[in-house]
């Protein structure tokens, strides 16, 4: 396989797509060069996606408005399967660890669920889970 240097190793560039495996197999077994051309629209529709989250966040504060505690629950659409080499649980794990953000919260708990669906696989992009959790917390 010949792939030009595109820099980085995250997002779509960091995974092994099923089509790439099939192309290698075809080329070796057909003893013939195989070319795969995919436009941007096809890639974005059929390849891995991310950031389809659902949040339930409850904040507890005293009479002066100081936050005393936060309870969170997140459901992450993980798609039909993991995008190798990443786990479909990565987004949910990040939500749990970064939901409080920069705030000092004396009591914090959060549950995250990665749910398998019939959609394209989940792929962590730059800023894994941060878009949804920042929106939910604020």
Q: PLM features: what roles do these ranges have?
A:
Residues 1-138:
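Structural alpha/beta core scaffold segments of enzyme domains
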């Amino acid at each position: 396989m010949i792939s030009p240097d595109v820099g980085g190793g995250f997002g779509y560039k960091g995974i092994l797509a099923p089509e790439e495996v099939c192309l290698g197999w075809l080329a070796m077994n057909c003893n013939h060069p195989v070319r795969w051309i995919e436009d941007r629209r096809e890639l974005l529709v059929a390849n891995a996606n991310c950031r389809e989250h659902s949040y339930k966040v409850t904040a507890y504060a005293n009479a002066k408005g100081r936050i005393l505690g936060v309870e969170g629950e997140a459901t992450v659409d993980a798609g039909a399967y993991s995008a190798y080499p990443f786990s479909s649980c990565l987004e949910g794990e990040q939500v749990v660890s970064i939901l409080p953000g920069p705030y000092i919260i004396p009591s914090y708990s959060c549950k995250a669920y990665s749910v398998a669906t019939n959609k394209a696989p989940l792929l962590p992009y730059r800023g894994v889970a941060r878009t949804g959790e920042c929106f939910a917390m604020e």
